[in-house]
Swiss-Prot record:
GO terms for cellular component: cytoplasm. Belongs to the radical SAM superfamily. Lipoyl synthase family. It comes from Rhodopirellula baltica (strain DSM 10527 / NCIMB 13988 / SH1). SMART domains: Elp3 (SM00729). This is Lipoyl synthase. PANTHER family: LIPOYL SYNTHASE, LIPOYL SYNTHASE, MITOCHONDRIAL. NCBIfam families: lipA, PRK05481.1, PRK12928.1. It catalyses: [[Fe-S] cluster scaffold protein carrying a second [4Fe-4S](2+) cluster] + N(6)-octanoyl-L-lysyl-[protein] + 2 oxidized [2Fe-2S]-[ferredoxin] + 2 S-adenosyl-L-methionine + 4 H(+) = [[Fe-S] cluster scaffold protein] + N(6)-[(R)-dihydrolipoyl]-L-lysyl-[protein] + 4 Fe(3+) + 2 hydrogen sulfide + 2 5'-deoxyadenosine + 2 L-methionine + 2 reduced [2Fe-2S]-[ferredoxin]. Its cofactor is [4Fe-4S] cluster. Binds 2 [4Fe-4S] clusters per subunit. One cluster is coordinated with 3 cysteines and an exchangeable S-adenosyl-L-methionine. [4Fe-4S] cluster 1 binds at residues 66, 71, 77, 306. Keywords: 4Fe-4S, Cytoplasm, Iron, Iron-sulfur, Metal-binding, S-adenosyl-L-methionine, Transferase.
C-alpha cells in the first residue's frame, strides 16, 4: 500500500499571488438579471435511455459526477447511455469554489466491490469508453490511487472498453500517480481548471499549479503510451494572455488533449460567473490550441472534461 499523503503536506515551493476579486472585462454578457445568453439555452433531450442510465446507477449503487456536479450535459449523455462514474463516495475533502459536489469528511472507506459494480454497469450500458473520476480523498494514505487502479483493471477485463481516469492531485504523491498509470488507462486526465493568478481562489489552498503540470509530465515518464488530457473553465475572470500562457504550459508538459468550456455557477454559494464567452471565441481558441500542437481540442460553451470523451480518445 502507498503511504505518502498527509493533510499538512505542501512539498512544492510554488507561490501564487493573493487574488483580488476580478473586474468584469469589457464586452461581458453577464447581465444584472442573471439571465443566460442565448447560446447557453437549449432543449433538454428526452429519451428512454435517460431512465435506463439512471436506473442502472441506482441498481448498482453507483454515483455519477454528472448528477453530483450538476453537469449541464447530463441529460444529453444519459440519452446516449453514457455517464462518468464517480468513485470513492460522494463527499469531497476539498472546498473548490466552483464545484457542486458535497464537501466534508467522507463517511466511509472505499467500497472494495465498487470496481466490479462499475464494470457490470458499463457492460449493461454497452459502453465502449468508460470514464472514471472521483471526489478528492485527502483522508486516504494513497488518495484513492489503488482504487482507481482496480477500477480500470475491472472495466477492461469485463468489457474490453477503453478507459479514461479523471483524477484528483494526490497531494503531490508520485507513487500514487504511478499506481494509477500501472493500470494502463487509455487516457489520463487532470484538469488545470484556471490560470495561475486565480488558482487558489478557484481550486482552494491545497492546489498547486506547478504540480498539476508536473503530473502530466510524470504520466508520460511512467508510460508514454497513455494519452494525457487537461481542461480549463472560462469566465472566471481570466485574461486572454493568462489563458494562452496556461495552454502553452500544458503543451510544454506533454498534454495531448485539451478541453475548454464555460464556467456556470451551480448555486449562490459558489464563485460567480464574471463573463460568458461567446461560441466564436471558443472556436478561435480551439484554432490557437491546435496550432500549439494539441492533438485534439474540444472547445465550446457546453464542453466539459468527459463530454464526448470517446471521440477524443480515439484520435491519433
Amino acid at each position: 500500500m502507498i503511504f505518502c499523503l498527509s493533510s499538512g503536506q505542501t512539498p512544492m515551493a510554488f507561490r501564487l499571488p493573493v487574488v483580488a476579486e476580478p473586474e468584469m472585462p469589457a464586452g461581458t454578457d453577464v447581465s444584472s438579471t442573471g439571465r443566460l445568453p442565448r447560446w447557453l439555452k437549449r432543449p433538454i433531450p428526452k429519451s428512454n435511455s435517460n431512465h435506463l442510465t439512471d436506473s442502472l446507477m441506482e441498481e448498482y449503487g453507483l454515483e455519477t459526477v454528472c448528477d453530483n456536479a450538476k453537469c449541464p450535459n447530463r441529460m444529453e449523455c444519459y440519452s446516449q447511455q453514457t455517464a462518468t462514474f464517480m468513485v470513492l463516495g460522494n463527499v469531497c475533502t476539498r472546498p473548490c469554489g466552483f464545484c457542486a459536489v458535497s464537501r466534508g469528511r467522507p463517511p466511509a472507506a472505499p467500497a472494495v466491490d465498487e470496481p466490479d459494480r462499475i464494470a457490470k454497469a458499463a457492460e449493461r450500458l454497452g459502453l465502449k469508453h468508460v470514464v472514471i473520476t472521483s471526489v478528492t480523498r485527502d483522508d486516504l494514505p494513497d488518495g484513492g490511487a489503488d482504487h482507481f487502479h482496480n477500477c480500470v483493471i475491472a472495466v477492461r477485463e469485463r468489457t474490453g472498453a477503453t478507459t479514461e481516469v479523471l483524477t484528483p492531485d494526490f497531494v503531490h504523491c508520485k507513487e500514487a500517480l504511478a499506481r494509477v498509470i500501472e493500470a494502463k488507462p487509455t487516457v489520463f486526465n487532470h484538469n488545470m481548471e484556471t490560470v495561475p493568478r486565480l488558482y487558489r481562489r478557484v481550486r482552494g489552498p491545497k492546489s498547486d499549479y506547478a504540480w498539476t503540470l508536473e503530473m502530466m509530465r510524470q504520466v508520460k515518464r511512467y508510460d508514454a503510451e497513455v494519452k494525457t488530457k487537461s481542461g480549463l473553465m472560462l469566465g472566471l475572470g481570466e485574461e486572454r494572455g493568462e489563458l494562452l500562457d496556461a495552454l502553452s504550459d500544458l503543451r510544454e508538459h506533454d498534454v495531448d488533449f485539451l478541453t475548454l468550456g464555460q464556467y456556470l455557477q451551480p448555486g449562490e454559494k459558489y464563485l460567480p460567473v464574471v463573463r460568458y464567452v461567446p461560441p466564436e471565441e471558443f472556436d478561435e481558441l480551439a484554432d490557437i490550441a491546435k496550432s500549439m500542437g494539441f492533438k485534439k481540442v474540444a472547445s465550446g460553451p457546453f464542453v466539459r472534461s468527459s463530454y464526448h470523451a470517446r471521440d477524443m480518445a480515439e484520435t491519433e
